[in-house]
Curated annotation (Swiss-Prot):
GO terms for biological process: cell division; embryo development ending in seed dormancy; regulation of cell cycle. It comes from Arabidopsis thaliana. The keyword Nucleotide-binding does not apply. Keywords: Cell cycle, Cell division, Cyclin. The keyword Cell division applies. It comes from the Eukaryota. Belongs to the cyclin family. Cyclin D subfamily. The gene is CYCD7-1. This is Putative cyclin-D7-1.
């Protein structure tokens, strides 16, 4: 302090910085609201209009998505993958933006790839990679791969495998991962109707949306429709309901009404019990956890089956180099645990 220039003086104590607007306040699962600054109605309506326009650019919903997942026999695989995403978010205290973004990446990537037959480990690899990507875009501190894979999976993957799979997914999605989700749209919508400070209703909306994303049938609706329908169901104030519907054109209103009916007809209790059962299952130890996958090389992002075939090739090449006579069948795609080190 004796060498200060211009005879400036140090403050007695550091000033407490003012909180920045729109920063997420999320220290626990019970706190899911954002600290929105005061925004006028016109600005919020503009934000909603921008979200609706952005939603059209991603085209990540519709009957074609539902039909695709059913035709590829991916309904159960998708459900369990999304259960794992939700459980991992809770275990690592990740943001809700992260889990909804990961689910969005998963659906879009799986839909645009050409794979004749999906298996459990393929789906788990895409789910792990999608969550890894989403956390890097949404979290201040990105969890390690070991932390992501700690619970709930039947396979473990090498860090190099996930890193290269990240590039494959990002290239396939053209690096466009900031899609509108039902969660992000719900945050905008509740700000418009003045519900930001109501923690209880915000928690109910978020929990309802977490149940909804696991339901393949809800994928036929745009995220904005799903978010609006969820808020509509949980609200009883007729004035608020009318103010919500007045934000949309007639075509959108009809979709919202249809989605509301679909949500009411869902067996939500059954879905929730399945999730609680899955969360309560005993966790497999590392020695029981299945196979560690490794992948090297450049692959065509248009054909997922070719990407996965490389595991068979790398396994056989390694075995030949070690002069091993007994090569596992190609369908097993098993790699030694030592490769995970």
């Amino acid at each position: 302090m004796d060498n200060l220039l211009c005879e400036e003086s140090w403050p007695a104590s550091p000033l407490t910085p003012e909180p920045l607007p729109n920063f997420r306040h999320r220290s626990h699962d019970n706190d899911v609201v954002k600290m929105y600054p005061e925004i006028d109605a016109a600005t919020m309506e503009e934000a909603i209009a921008m979200d609706l326009e952005k939603e059209l650019c991603f085209n990540n919903h519709g009957d074609k998505f539902v039909e695709f997942f059913v035709s590829k026999k991916l309904t159960d695989y998708r459900f369990h993958a999304f259960q794992w995403l939700i459980q991992t978010r809770s275990r690592l205290n990740l943001s809700y933006e992260t889990v909804f973004s990961a689910a969005n990446c998963f659906d879009r990537f799986v839909y645009m790839t050409c794979c004749d037959e999906w298996t459990n480990w393929m789906v788990e690899l895409v789910a792990v990679t999608s969550l890894s990507i989403a956390s890097k875009f949404n979290e201040v501190t990105t969890p390690l791969l070991e932390e992501l894979e700690m619970e709930g999976l039947t396979h473990m993957f090498h860090v190099n495998t996930v890193a290269q799979m990240e590039l494959i997914i990002l290239k396939a999605l053209e690096w466009r991962v900031n899609a509108v989700t039902s969660y992000t749209f719900s945050q905008t919508l509740v700000s418009k109707i003045g519900m930001v400070g109501d923690h209880m209703i915000m928690n109910r909306i978020t929990n309802h949306l977490l149940d909804v994303i696991c339901d393949l049938k809800m994928l036929q609706y745009p995220p904005s429709v799903v978010a609006t329908a969820a808020i509509w169901i949980l609200m009883e104030d007729k004035v608020c309901r009318e103010s919500i519907m007045n934000l949309f054109e007639q075509n959108h209103k009809e979709k919202i009404v249809k989605c509301v009916d679909g949500m009411k007809n869902r067996d939500i209790d059954h879905q929730s019990s399945r999730r609680r059962y899955s969360e309560g299952r005993s966790i497999l130890s590392l020695l029981q956890r299945g196979d560690v996958m490794n992948m090297n090389g450049d692959y065509n992002v248009e054909d997922l089956s070719k990407i996965f075939q490389i595991f068979r090739y790398e396994k056989k090449k390694r075995d030949r180099g070690n002069h091993q006579d007994n090569i596992r069948p190609a369908k097993r795609m098993t790699i030694e645990m030592s490769n995970y080190i």
